[in-house]
Regions:
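ATP-binding glycine-rich loop module of kinase domains
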Residues: 2-54
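Structural motif
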Residues: 25, 77-79, 135-136
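Conserved kinase catalytic-core helix
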Residues: 62, 66-68, 94-130, 135, ...
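Conserved structural core of kinase catalytic domains
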Residues: 35, 49-53, 64, 68-110
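C-lobe/activation-segment region of protein kinase-like
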Residues: 140-215
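Short hydrophobic-acidic sequence motifs that mark active-site Asp/Glu residues
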Residues: 13, 28-32, 84, 141-143, ...
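Conserved hydrophobic "DFG−1" position in protein kinase catalytic cores
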Residues: 13-16, 33, 75, 87, ...
Length: 215
């Protein structure tokens, strides 16, 4: 069953048994398959999709090792350019905050997880509440398709800046207080000095954005 069609990849929901030939606690799995681009030369397209598939799988695994809740990887299929992973059964934080309002405990969890990723040299690249799932009281991060490995303060600042923009766009009524709580969780992992550096960098990023709009 198709879950989502995207510009870069399609997501499918399947039974574990149908893919691997045996049952595993009635588990369901997600298959993320990168879309072939007909405008590219076949060999180049295969190389790009293969590289991005391996890169994403590697970063998901690195995030999990770093203590960030993320899907378990079952298989990386280079021939099909796909990742077979655990299906996280829960509610997206987009819906959770929309129905429950401000949730300080969850906000703090988000901050700690983002801090853990940055401390491990991971830039998620798409930190929205649509890419976070609440399951059994834990916040799982999904869709690492735009992620990369970097410890650059600029890229970390952009990561957090885009998260704040996503909160303001989707959860305007609680975004300011929620972002403060997220930053508290972030600081709990990376420390006050690093937290201050990130906030200063976000200010610089926002100033650059305002200057571009004037131009």
């Amino acid at each position: 069953m198709i879950l989502k069609k995207g510009a870069e990849a399609d997501l499918y929901l399947e039974d574990f048994k149908d893919v691997f030939g045996f049952d595993f606690y009635n588990e369901k799995i997600v298959i993320k398959k990168r879309v072939k681009k007909n405008y590219r030369i076949n060999e180049i397209d295969d190389m790009i999709r293969g590289f991005r598939t391996v890169k994403e799988a590697k970063i998901i695994n690195k995030a999990k090792i770093s203590g960030v809740y993320s899907p378990v990887l079952y298989l990386v299929d280079l021939k099909e350019k796909s990742i077979v992973m655990e299906y996280i059964n829960g509610i997206r934080l987009k819906e959770h905050f929309s129905s429950k309002g401000l949730d300080k405990k969850i906000g703090f969890q988000i901050g700690k997880s983002v801090g853990s990723m940055h401390k491990a040299g991971i830039i998620h690249g798409d930190l929205t509440t649509s890419n976070m799932i609440l399951s059994d009281g834990k916040v799982y991060f999904i869709d690492f398709g735009l992620s990369e490995e970097s410890e650059e303060i600029e890229k970390q600042g952009i990561d957090v800046h885009l998260l704040r923009q996503a909160l303001e766009s989707t959860h305007f009524d609680i975004s300011e207080e929620l972002f403060k709580i997220i930053i508290e969780g972030y600081s709990d992992v990376v420390g006050n000095k690093k937290k201050d550096e990130i906030l200063q960098r976000i200010e610089q990023i926002e100033k650059r954005g305002r200057y571009r709009k004037r131009d």
